[in-house]
A protein has these predicted regions:
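Catalytic cores of nucleophile-dependent amide-cleaving enzymes
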Residues: 1-20, 85, 90-178
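Loop/turn elements at helix/coil->beta-strand transitions in domains of secreted/extracellular proteins
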Residues: 29-35, 56-57, 77-81, 118-122, ...
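Functional beta-strand-loop-alpha-helix junction segments that form "active/interaction loops"
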Residues: 35-84, 88-96, 106-112
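Short, non-transmembrane alpha-helical segments in secretory-pathway proteins
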Residues: 248-291
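Structured catalytic cores of large enzymes
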Residues: 1-57
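Active-site-proximal C-terminal subdomain of hydrolase catalytic domains
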Residues: 126-242
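Exposed beta-strand-loop-beta-strand "reactive/processing" segments of non-cytosolic proteins
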Residues: 282-319
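Short, glycine/acidic-rich beta->alpha junctions
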Residues: 63-67, 135-139, 307
Length: 330
């Protein structure tokens, strides 16, 4: 089943979402008229560019090179496929998405920015709490501001999201990158979400971070909507052939089959040195070591408090201390 939803909020009215249904009914954007834009934290530019090249054959804009005051001028207001790989936060006062370069975390995009978009658009965001809306006012949530203005489809996470800084990445990188690439290729937003979930589950046995990604990313908007293929079609007409994708239900308990463990000082030192080298902003932070009781793998979790949010690195490593995979919170 392809399911989308509309977020609710305190003191909402029918008119808040009336615009959405009018927009989706009369949208006439075809696949040849798609104009993409991407904005990413400088820290994640490598992985962001790999995915945005697949989506748009372009490079992303970066923050802190741009902040929320300059981003909208550089992104423009006429784009209709938007990609964001930024930080997000849960705090009610931290309403924006944030860039990063080393220890600099500027506000990169805000609810007021999204209201300036003039074209109808589809959006995907990798940020932690990128799709937050429960117990927030409209002006505190980019999701709410988007869905009550020009947004036709929005995919994001309600909780902490994870990805990588280099290579094709993982988790949120795969989810949002595959989703927007599929939308760009003419699939409905519901089908695109299904393809993204299928891509995430197809490689191997899922670990805790991948299971959480499947549970935390939600689609907002009519799942049957897609950019039309020619000017004689209507955007809300279902595809004639809908692929049958098998997406196995994740083992939710697998996300919590962890126990605190100990390794030798030598092994912990090897792991720490690797993390401190790749992520110098975490230098000196001591990790908590966990063991997955289902398969015996180890992970080291580093937490760093910033002014607006907590950053997390979860590094899976072998018995000899070699880093196998690294997940970075968004």
């Amino acid at each position: 089943m392809r399911v989308g939803r509309l977020p609710t909020f305190k003191n909402e009215s029918f008119n808040d979402f009336k615009t959405y249904f009018e927009n989706i009914k009369f949208c006439t954007i075809n696949t040849k008229q798609i104009i993409e834009a991407g904005l990413a934290a400088k820290q994640w530019v490598n992985t962001s560019n790999i995915w945005f090249d697949k989506i748009a054959n372009k490079k992303v804009l970066t923050s802190p090179q741009l902040d929320k005051f300059s981003a909208i001028q550089n992104i423009g207001t006429e784009k209709n496929l938007l990609y964001f790989n930024l930080h997000g936060a849960e705090d009610s006062d931290a309403c924006d998405w944030y860039g990063q370069e080393n220890e600099n975390y500027p506000s990169a995009f805000s609810p007021s920015n999204i209201l300036k978009q003039e074209s109808l658009y589809i959006l995907g965001v990798e940020a932690c709490y990128g799709a937050r809306y429960i117990n927030y006012k409209k002006e505190q949530s980019i999701l709410l501001s988007a869905m009550t203005s020009k947004c036709l489809g929005f995919l994001g996470s309600s909780k902490i999201a994870y990805g990588a800084c280099y290579g094709e990445g993982s988790c949120a990188n795969v989810m949002i990158g595959t989703y927007l690439k599929s939308v760009r290729n003419g699939l409905s937003i519901g089908e695109s979400f299904a393809v993204a979930r299928s891509e995430l589950t197809s490689k191997r046995k899922l670990n805790a971070k991948e299971i959480k990604t499947l549970l935390e990313f939600s689609l907002y908007g009519d799942p049957s909507f897609r950019f039309i293929e020619n000017s004689n079609q209507k955007s809300f007409v279902a595809q004639k052939s809908i692929s049958k994708l098998h997406i196995p239900m994740p083992d939710v308990l697998g996300a919590v089959n962890l126990e605190i463990a100990k390794v030798s000082e030598k092994i912990e030192s090897i792991v720490n040195n690797s993390i401190y080298s790749d992520y110098p902003e975490f230098n000196g932070i001591k990790p908590i070591i966990y063991k997955d009781t289902s398969d015996g793998t180890y992970s080291a979790v580093y937490k760093k408090d910033n002014e607006k949010f907590i950053q997390i690195i979860d590094a899976y490593f072998s018995e000899d201390g070699q880093i196998l995979r690294t997940y970075v919170s968004k």
